[in-house]
């Protein structure tokens, strides 16, 4: 199954307007100019933004702050009124919106209404789910919402393997939910959402890669993608999750048996120019690796997004990236510069 999908690509490009295209050109140009000059130059506003629907999750995945309940920041749900206000600010230039950061999006009761609102502004929408809440009704409502992309986590093809990473999860619920989505997409004769399984490759499941591909074909999803896993204590790998399949790992084994990151840690990062994250309570953080929102660029309850995007604190953070990315804590285990997706 190929990762390229023509319908999805056409759908994404259909969201482009002259204003969004010009904004994207400005953002891309300023990023490359910053790389070349080693000075932080920021033109335009984000092409893509991630909103956090909630910090809550029903699972206990061993490498996830939400699953481990290890946040020090407040937990809660994104509110519809606040989301609507933010979209009204961002929509003219915003092309791509992801509804995930931490937590399970479907636990927010307003989640699909948020999708509908973003879709009404002709923004491409995507979300990632563990698949446990794709009931028949939720599946129908998901297709009707106009959601453009649905990523379903499938980290094993048998319950015993699946639950080694998705602790507390039920594979049968994921498969049933997937069947519901595929059914309603056909029943409503809809081209969206583009549905694919995301298979997070860890040592317990790496022997099931081909089985997962066959399962994807059988269920009727549009594709499957293998994702390399982020391991927090990768040097020692106490949970024994780093796969032996080295091309599907972000880490390599050293002669002493410990691991190191494959990341060359070059002093630049595309994310800082085009794709920030907004937490459920309105904090703007630089990227999705700031799980605990330690690097707060601003609070949308006090300032507009464009004020925060252009303020000195954000510019200074970009400057630090360009001077010494390895010295920034959230960059130490970042995927910018290493292989994230495998074939």
Which residues does each predicted region cover?
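Radical SAM enzyme [4Fe-4S]-AdoMet core and its adjacent flexible, acidic
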Residues: 1-13, 52, 73, 78, ...
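Conserved alpha-helical substructure of the radical SAM core
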Residues: 2-149, 160, 164, 168-172, ...
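Disulfide-bonded cysteine motifs in exported proteins
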Residues: 52, 56-59, 264, 326-329
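Local cysteine-cluster metal-coordination motifs and their immediate loop/turn environment
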Residues: 58-66, 289, 329-336
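Residue-level signal for alpha-helical context at structural boundaries
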Residues: 101, 108, 136, 192, ...
